[in-house]
Amino acid sequence: MGNLFTKSTYEWIKQVDTSKADLFKQAEESMMKLQDQKTKEDFVQEQVKINETYSTLEHFVEEHRKELATLSPQHEQDVDILLQSLKLRKETLMRYELPNWNVAHNVPIYDVEQHPMVLRDRMMAENLEYLAEEMYPTEKMIVWGHNYHVRKNNSKVKYADYGQNFLNNMGDYLPDSFKKQTYTVGIYAYSGASLDSSDNKTVTPVNKEKDPTSLESLLKYANHSSLFVDLVHTPYNKRTSWIYTPRIALYWGFLKEEMILKEQYDGIIWIERITPAKII
């Protein structure tokens, strides 16, 4: 049954109301199957049904807040997280899923802001702001995400082979006042392989062909198995000019990107050889 969130939430709600737990399970399963709809009319009809179900679940959680809180380690805070998660399910359903379906069915998208990849990152930025300002306003946070999502100005990064700029990402949509409070780290590898997140099965090797002035190649010269490079406190000079000038780096170890590292990251973690993750 779905992922860890789905399983744990189902068991949590089940302790209060079995029928609502089953309703939650049904909504999650329907959400996963939504992209299988053959026509837009069928899609929208199913979309409305799922949205109504999540609204019913939101109302249930609000009504049974105290009961649910007593059954959870962090009590009230866990209920707040659950409500935010249900809200995000609805927003994903109503803002992201149809554009994603359109792309899968070759329906043209004329407004780049309505592209599912852009919508996804805008929603990520909105959620991060909520977590930082509303849920954990006095605490430090660690946000783990792919380089593509966390770097600060993704729209300035280019596909090196085509000269075309990337789409806006989460970092682009975060306000400057927010970004000034963050320390953003990019992670890159020289060799090895990683697990493809699209199926958690395919092993994708790191491209062996390297530009001699690329990020990966330059840090290889240090002759260490791993490195951390701070970019914030590194002044410009002849030896550090590579941080301030356009540089090739590999997206997921295989796609050439061109960027000015200083515009994107506050630090870099470089690993000489990576190995694929093992799914537990």
Predicted regions and their residues:
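Structured catalytic-domain cores with a bias toward divalent-metal coordination
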Residues: 1-280
